[in-house]
Structures are given as C-alpha cells and as structure tokens.
Amino acid sequence: MQFFSTRDQNRKVTSSQAIAQGLSDEGGLFVPESFPQVDVKALCGLDYPALADAVVREYLTDYDPAFLTEATRSTYGAAFGGKAGYLAPVEGDTYALELWHGPTCAFKDYALQLMPKLLVEAKKNLGRTEKTLILVATSGDTGKAALDGYHDIPGVEIAVFYPTGGTSEIQRLQMATQEGANVAVYAVRGNFDDAQTGVKKVFGDKAIAAELEKRNIRLSSANSINWGRLVPQIVYYFAAYAQLLKAGKITFGDEVDFCVPTGNFGDILAGYYAKQMGLPVGKLVCASNENNVLTDFLTTGTYTAKREFFKTTSPSMDILVSSNLERLLYHVTGSDAEVAGFMQQLAATGSYTVRPETLAAIQETFSCGWSSEDEVAEEIRSRYEKDGYLCDTHTAVAFHVAAQKKRQGVPMVVLSTASPFKFPRSVLSALGKAAPENDFEAMQQLEAATGHAAPASLAALRSKPERFDTVIAPAQIAEVAMGYQA
C-alpha cells in the first residue's frame, strides 16, 4: 500500500514514511492509494485488539505483521480497562460508543497510545536514527493524549501548543502536569486555528527543516493530519457494528448511522474509511457546535473560515479550519490540482466553493447539524433525567443533532468522545446545579449529584505539580522548534 499527497499525486510514500513524516513537503496530507476490501463478517467475530490488528495491517503493509499483532494487543488491553470500543445502550435504537475509557479519558487515546509504537517502528523500517521532534496543536484532548503516549519514548521530543483560555481547566492541567523528560507545553495567545496555523507554518518552512536536519532532527506530527492518527480510529466503527450484531439488534448487512461531534474532521473521516472498506455505514452525521463552519459547508458547498469565533463549552470543537476535510475532498474529486486550488483559496481569502456535483457526492454519505450552547446544556440535562445517561458537552452536541437526523428503523450510534468529568463545571451547570469556580470541587459535586465516579486519573490531577506555564504568540512556535538540539 502506497500513500500520496492530496496536493500532489506524484509524491508517493510508504506507510512508514507517511507516519514518520506526518505532512507532505508541499503541505498536502497523505491518503491511501486505495481502500482495501475486508471480510466484515469475519472481523465482527474478533476481540478489539485482534480487530485493530486486522484493520491496521491492511494499510501498514511495510510493517512486520508480528509487530502489529503485538502492538495492538499491548495497546488495547489493560489501559482501556476492558472497555475498548464499548457500546452503551441509551434510548431505543440509539447508542453511545464510549471512547473515553483510555488513560486520558478521551477518544484520542485510541490512536495516540498506538501511534508512538508505529513511529518508532517506522524509523526502524526506514533505517533512521535521527531525533524526531513532534509538534502538536491541540484544542484540548489531543495534547494530553499525545503527551501521555510519547512521554519518555527514546529518540522523540514533543512540544504541545494549546490556545490560552481555550480548554477546560481539567484539560489544561492534564497537559501542564505531564511528566516526562522529553515533553514541553505552551499556551498560545489566540484560538486553536492560530496554534494550528503556527504549527503548519513550521512544517512548511524549508529553512527550518534544513537547519533542524543539520542537527539530526526531523519534524513530525501527532495531529490528525498524520495518517498514523487516522488508521486506528477506523477500528471502533467496526467494533460498534460487531456489538450490535452480537446483541441481535441488527442483521448482517443492515445499515447503521453514526453521529460524530466534529472539529478537525478526523474522527468522522475514519467512519468514511470504514464505509469504503465495506462496513455497512449508512449516514455519517457531522455534529458541530456554534462554530458551525462544517454545517454550512456540507449544506451549501462553500467553506468560509473568516467568521466570528465562539468559545464554547465544547472546546475541542472550537475550530474554524478543519484540516481533514482536505482528505475527503481529494477522495471525492480525485483531483490533487483541484484540492491544491481549494487550499490556496482558503489561505488567501479564507473561503472556497466546491462544484455542485462534488457537494452532491459528499451529501450521499454525510449529513450535518449543529447545537447552540443552550441546546447543549438542555441535552445534558434531559438525557440524564430521561435515560440516566451522563454525557460531556461534546457528546451532547452529537446527541442533539442525532435526534434531528435519526432515521426510522436505522440504529444511530453517537460517538461519545470524552468523559463528562473533563468538563465538570459545564456538566454540573447543565444539570441545574450551581457550579463552583474550582473544577475539582465541581468534579466532587458532580459525583455526588449523579452517583458516577470520576476517573482516577482526572481526580489525581489535583495533587500534581504544574510544570508548564509559558505563554507565547503564534509566531513564536517557530522559535520553539528552532530551540531544539539533537
């Protein structure tokens, strides 16, 4: 299996190269040359580690199969508490795919617990001995998940950049207290898009790359722009379908719809990849918060990033430039030149418009909707009062949209992407309680009000010392990168 850039089909690489490099030299994203067709029924009989092994090996064809078997088995065992890809019944034929039972309590763990192993093996496959410098822009969950996955990995340094004031306090503390000799965390003035643009500029700066190469350092990414982030996320769509099949809720071949709280478009794109591999996915419902740039695009075909930015209670979705949409545009248009043109227009004017036939092709699989802040709070409250199901703010966005888009007789799986205890003040307020200013007091009150226990890793943050408190401008991200030595 080869991979090539969304902006230049002539730039072909192996999966090891795609994972080690992260981003193509000209700024494009790596995509697979084809979608492998799998025996879905056979996969549905596997446990989660074996399922992950079977899916990722279809794409990572230059990796040793024995390595992939061991890597997936060791990743998706104890760290997920026996709940990897756990599907919870909620109401009727609506379900929650709980993706927050990993070490950092967010869905990013599924990729970022495996990806460090894939990177180390990729370097071995390529005969590379240089230091890898990973730069990560985060709207909250990716940062901690990447730090947890990569801390103290030999031959790797990682620097994480998050928007100051743009995460929950729990998310900030998860990053600021991270242990490890090879980790660094910076708050960036501005929003997530400012941080992400700053990181992308570093990746696109040939002078920086050349200087770092002299020091025997190569840049890489742990964001969902890296193919190594996407491939593990395909797996849990198969896992959800398998559980519905095993429970007798569907017959093999029946369609299942998925509603995904969406920011950078990586999680929902993994569902598209699962569908292309043969999984009977019906509709992929893209759920946005008040930063509803994707809702507008999927409705009109015009992407407009120059718009008012809202800080919401679902900060991981507070994004106006959704990077992985570029991959979908490539798959639908089949044209690297067209995609490159869209990205040039976006950089120059903040907007682009796809052809009507392109939009129609996208709408065959994708539908969309968005939730206001009031609707998110109401969804958390009503969902808990009606079904006893406690969800976080991002999941509430998806539940609200899923109710609007539910098709009669077709199961709807809502991707639950984070523990409600990562956002205790927002969830407590939504339940009609007066939320204290302190997140840990809010966490305790949320436990008392609901009878749910906070994950131990989150409760333990209260006693951990903060290691990182530096605030920088977006332009200083390049200075941070240039400060590293081999």
Predicted regions and their residues:
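PLP-dependent amino-acid enzyme catalytic core
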Residues: 1-486
